[in-house]
């Protein structure tokens, strides 16, 4: 039912990954940007559990607005999804200018939107490193989120900067690992949403039970 609602609307707040009355909205459009955004939310909530984040997924957009051609999001629905005043970090699978141009259809302060997307930066490299080069990786998004929460006073500024430096270090660590091994760190591909971790563990235990 929820999947059908998203197909009809073209965008949806993912309640299972969201808090009420958010301090920050993290949005994504596209499979890989969505995975990186979800991983970034996991990172931020791990370190800043009191920070309230809304997760928005966009599955369809048009030149005249977010949503589908049959059901373009009007201003009221746009504000309901993205709020009318909170900062938004938007991870996109295409050029950032595409999303920026769509925002012109709405009465919105575009400066509160931090839009990430393809910059034509990178060549033959690993999938995650391509995200890093385009600043669309989970670590880049988490850094942006920490700093935004620090600017807004949700997290102490010094703490936000410290957390940002930790994840810049994670980026550097993975870059060094790629140079030595030609692949990303195993933890990158191994990530799953927290609610799924117990399911994975249960499946593994069941498998071992059958083979022992």
Regions found by a protein language model. Give the residues of each.
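Thiamine diphosphate
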Residues: 1-211
């Amino acid at each position: 039912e929820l999947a059908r609602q998203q197909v009809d609307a073209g965008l949806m707040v993912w309640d299972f990954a969201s808090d009420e009355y958010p301090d920050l909205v993290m949005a994504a459009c596209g499979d890989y940007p969505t995975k990186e955004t979800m991983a970034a939310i996991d990172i931020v909530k791990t370190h800043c559990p009191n920070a309230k984040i809304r997760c928005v997924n966009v599955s369809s957009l048009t030149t005249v607005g977010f949503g589908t051609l049959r059901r373009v999001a009007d201003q009221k629905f746009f504000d309901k999804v993205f709020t009318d005043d909170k900062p938004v970090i938007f991870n996109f699978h295409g050029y950032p200018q595409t999303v920026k141009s769509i925002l012109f259809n709405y009465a919105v302060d575009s400066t509160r939107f931090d839009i990430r997307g393809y910059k034509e930066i990178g060549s033959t490299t690993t999938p995650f490193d391509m995200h890093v080069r385009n600043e669309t990786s989970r670590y880049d998004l988490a850094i942006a989120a920490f700093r935004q929460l620090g600017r807004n006073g949700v997290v102490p500024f010094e703490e936000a900067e410290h957390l940002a430096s930790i994840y810049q270090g994670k980026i550097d660590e993975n870059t060094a690992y790629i140079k030595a091994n030609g692949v990303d760190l195993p933890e990158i591909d191994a990530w799953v949403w927290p609610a799924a971790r117990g399911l994975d563990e249960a499946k593994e235990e069941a498998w071992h039970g059958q083979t022992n």
